[in-house]
Amino acid sequence: MLRARLLVPLVRPALVHRLDRCYSTALGSRFRKSNAVRSELKFDFPDVPVKEELFVQETPDKPLKENKTHVSDEDIDSLFDSLMSDHKAAEATEQHKELPPAEQERPSGANTHTAPIKHDTKSPMEYLAKSKLTPHVSRQVAKAMAGSPTQLLLATPASHHISTPAYQNDLWKHVISTLNTSKFQIPDFNSLMTTIPVDIRAQFLPQIEEWISQRGVKPSAITYGQVMLGYAEDGNVEKVEERFRQMIDNNITPTVHTYAHRLKACDKRGDLKQAMEIFDDLKLAQQLYGIRPNQVIFTTLISTSLRNHKVELASQIFEYMKYASLETQPTAHTYNSLITASAIRSNTERALDLFEEMKQKSVANVRTYQSLILACLRQEKYHLKAWELLLELREQHSESFYSRHTLVVVFQAAAVTGDLVFLRSLYKQLCMSPETYPDAILTQLLMQAYARYDTRTKPVASSALRATWGRLYGGNAQEMMRGFLFPDIEGMVQLNEEHPGMIPPFLPTNTIESLSFDRKKIIAESRAIFQFLKNNKPQLLDNIAATDYLKAGARHRDFPEFLRRYNEVSVGAGEAEGAVISPSEMKTYSARQKKPQRYDLQTQFSPAPRSDAHFFIALNAVQADCIADASERDPNLNHPLRRLTPQEMTDRLEFSQDVWVERGKWRKSDAYKNKYRTEAQQISADYNFALKIINALAALKQLGEAAAILSATPATFNWKKHDLAFFHNVAQAFYHEEAMKQIHKAVSRSKHLDEVIRNPDSEKSAEFDVFSI
């Protein structure tokens, strides 16, 4: 099970649940019936009658078989050189030039760089007159901004969800440094704080509070509220609680917003214990000040619970919201948080239940569809459902479809379902203009698609997108693509010729249907794309993209190419010192992040210090390279291994031994301890590495070595039959008695370990740490 999580992090096998054990978020939820929950969360809200509902489980589809063929290195190198030749000529004629910094940061469509606000023709005073600034503050701000080519970004409710760009932060620093507050009153200070974007406000609050103290003016409830909001956004729980105590000491009555700020600070820090204590205080505040919790209070508490992986608690609070009162009915944001949590736990059935509730209440929005699509992508049997929801999203919310978040979801759907042809076509379209150039997230997903793509005989029929859209367009892939993202798709074929400095060297194709990928094309194109981005757009290649690039070499069974990539994207612990950036400094962008990305345009691609992510892929590559394709297998043999030359066997065995030694050294480093902070995490990581080295040695027919490692593993390793199935099959095929004996012993020991867990008083076996070598 642990191995499956590492090899396929986004797609788990479909689990068949019994209806009597499934959880439904319909009105008959068991959470509403829990007296313990009602007493824990109880406020003076009326009860609501209950109804019961059930849901239907879909049946999983059978996966198609993969058609694998071995590829020669000469063919790959030849194709790679042909792909890169046009770009080398373009560089020689200086057709490829870097964009100016201002244009590099400009967003549109898929690009997530944050751009300067276009200069308005209105005067600064006209612009500031519409803000919440008092006239006295507006005049000083206008004076400070005189001559500036860009306008100052002012806080709005919508801007709370957008990251303030660095240059706007500098502008605000300039404005604050030039203010003369000698005549400021409390309304002036309040308007100033309200106007500063909330995500950068905390850094200016000490100066503003000092000005208030020097002026000797008395802070109001609004003053404390804006100060607490700024510190809460920064996750500074101590500062927020200190200001709350000052409010009480100054006899200023707190409001529901005051408690919302306190909970928000806990949410930003992920402090669930403190949040629950504040929630208990809120119950007392209801009696003292007549404060009743609103949607924001409950939604923030749900968010904090989810940050701490307390999905059960979040669900209980959610159910209580629905039945407490009309004022506390869950919002779209609340539903979306629960759908996202269900996606993380691969509980797609519950996510679909929540979606049906939202449709009944007409509160489903674009974010709902995005979260639900990601939930469907976590289970293979719902992949087609994900594409159907994507079509529905485009029809229901066409005005909001072309956004960064939706584009990331489209790329994720294509990457997870292995629709490389569709994904690379979209990526190429985005490269047509600097306004829409792909970001690091989309580059990650492109590399993931190369790693996940199955070389099948009929890729069009195997595509989840075409299987779904074929019903609408009669299987015409060209018609499906036309206008999906941009209306001017007809010129896609000539992009390499028209934009040689911007378009990566994709394989040419006349139509989408004409491109059929095999291993040679996948390896050559992914290598060419990576080299192009490495030389021209290194800021788009983070650690995740490099890892997926490495997986593509391992997945498509070209061991020499994999070794080249392994040394290109990673270095050993000894080589890393002074040569590459430290792991803490490495940039890794997440598709789940809500705020736009900021890139250092001066960055260069650097190989990462090796860790378990690299070691696991390396051993998987050895095992995959030893397994024969269906066309290569000898029908007279009862094992799946292909015949290797003595030199190939030696090379792969030496590489596996090098990985073993290097991982042992890394295990003693601080990087290992920082990555796995608990004993359970360390045991899990060591277990997975032991399993992979055993399978690699078994694939190399080194059954005695594999059996020796298995026998030396600690007693804390809970070996299961399905984990050792590959080793068992090979050992059985070669009649290796010692290996069979050790497998039986390890599995029996695990059964004894299960008994020890159930009965702590039973005898515990001694432990020997094989990884201390």
Swiss-Prot record:
UniProt main location, coarse: mitochondrion
Source species, domain of life: Eukaryota
Annotated InterPro entries: Pentatricopeptide_rpt, PROP1-like_PPR_dom, TPR-like_helical_dom_sf
Segments for region (Disordered): 89-122
Extent of Basic and acidic residues compositional bias: 89-106
Family to which this protein belongs: Belongs to the CCM1 family.
Role description: Regulates mitochondrial small subunit maturation by controlling 15S rRNA 5'-end processing. Localizes to the 5' precursor of the 15S rRNA in a position that is subsequently occupied by mS47 in the mature yeast mtSSU. Uses structure and sequence-specific RNA recognition, binding to a single-stranded region of the precursor and specifically recognizing bases -6 to -1. The exchange of Ccm1 for mS47 is coupled to the irreversible removal of precursor rRNA that is accompanied by conformational changes of the mitoribosomal proteins uS5m and mS26.
Protein's recorded name: Mitochondrial 15S rRNA processing factor CCM1
